[in-house]
């Protein structure tokens, strides 16, 4: 009986150790980062607004069709104040997309209610196109993201807002219009793929 108990205790202890070791290796918790999108995983982390055909395809979360012709969003269920977002995305040349932050109205996402780091190479006014924060911080010249994989790093720390696209700083300003809220991923037109999106609170 004692031997059985000892063996059982050892098995439970080993299982607990293995579980802890496994958790410590999870990318979602490494260095304070939380994975919102990790390859084809992550749709469950968002609420959907609109009718774009968000789906998992070839290791990414993808949308390329919107029957309503109005922007659609994946909106986090968590609100964030100060943070860094890192994202890997692919956009077609005609894509209209973006990463929205500090959305004060989670059910009414837009460039008036959020900070939008734009992904829109063909925007009629390119000063607020790809790399800009729409209606807040312009870019000149506008970088292009279409037809390739790109990286975005978006930092919001109090009024300090910074955007880095493919290693190039495109925005570095002070603005206090919005202070906290969810993060949202947009599909408007064209094809957008998110392979990685992670966030770390500051």
Mark where each language-model region is:
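Bacterial N-terminal signal peptides
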Residues: 10-21
């Amino acid at each position: 009986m004692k031997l059985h108990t000892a063996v059982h205790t050892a098995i439970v202890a080993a299982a607990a150790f293995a579980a802890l070791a496994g958790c410590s290796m999870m990318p979602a918790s490494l260095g304070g980062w939380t994975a919102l999108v990790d390859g084809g995983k992550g749709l469950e982390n968002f609420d959907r607004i609109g009718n774009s055909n968000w789906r998992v395809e070839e290791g990414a979360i993808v949308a390329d069709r919107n029957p309503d012709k109005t922007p659609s969003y994946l909106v986090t269920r968590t609100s964030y104040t100060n943070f860094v977002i890192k994202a890997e995305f692919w956009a077609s040349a005609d894509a209209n997309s973006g990463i929205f932050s500090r959305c004060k109205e989670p059910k009414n996402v837009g460039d008036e209610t959020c900070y939008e780091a734009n992904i829109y190479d063909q925007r009629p006014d390119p000063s607020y196109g790809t790399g800009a924060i729409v209606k807040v911080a312009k870019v000149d010249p506008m970088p292009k993201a279409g037809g390739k994989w790109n990286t975005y790093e978006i930092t919001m720390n109090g009024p300090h807002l910074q955007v880095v696209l493919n290693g190039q700083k495109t925005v570095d300003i002070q603005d206090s219009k919005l202070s906290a809220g969810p993060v949202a991923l947009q599909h408007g037109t064209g094809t957008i793929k998110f392979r990685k999106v992670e966030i770390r609170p500051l």
